[in-house]
Amino acid sequence: MIQTRNQYLQFMLVMLAAWGISWGARFVMEQAVLLYGSGKNYLFFSHGTVLMYLLCVFLVYRRWIAPLPVVGQLRNVGVPWLVGAMAVVYVGVFLLGKALALPAEPFMTKLFADKSIPDVILTLLTIFILAPLNEETLFRGIMLNVFRSRYCWTMWLGALITSLLFVAAHSQYQNLLTLAELFLVGLITSVARIRSGGLLLPVLLHMEATTLGLLFG
């Protein structure tokens, strides 16, 4: 009975922490945008501010809330299959988009528009480093941790739910096909987190997704 109560309290602590940290990240990003404005480098400043916030929270979370390994296991977790699956998703969506004559996402077409070389460098730093670190820590780390239990199926349920939340967080995209693509990216990185136990592999796969996204538009 005591063990059950302790497990319930631990679950509530992890869930409330995930909710609080997520809303905290959103608040920090909104404040960064308000302070900086919607200039050419607002993505860099907003994501950079969130990363500093998450670094502080991450240390506290791992110490007092729940375990959250950084590296995890990288062998015998199906890395080639995960890398290949990510490539298949982006190539498939690209070909389907061409077949349906879908327009390019406005967000992507404006990402590097009218930017100087320093601005482009900051944008690349944001989408290749800052965004993967922030989003994987939040979605595949802190949020997915809510579904940890002695039952394996709870983590897979968490993979579905956090992938939907991942899609909802990317409201800058308009095409349904892009949103489906993001959902699959969320699933693949969730599988990587579950199988490896750490955040490194999901972050690396997110970077692969960013590369493929730029290549295929």
Swiss-Prot record:
One of its GO terms (molecular function) is endopeptidase activity. Keywords: Plasmid. It holds the Pfam family Rce1-like. InterPro entries: Rce1/LyrA-like_dom (IPR003675). GO terms for biological process: CAAX-box protein maturation. It comes from the Bacteria. This is Uncharacterized 24.3 kDa protein. It comes from Escherichia coli. The lineage of its organism: Bacteria, Pseudomonadati, Pseudomonadota, Gammaproteobacteria, Enterobacterales.
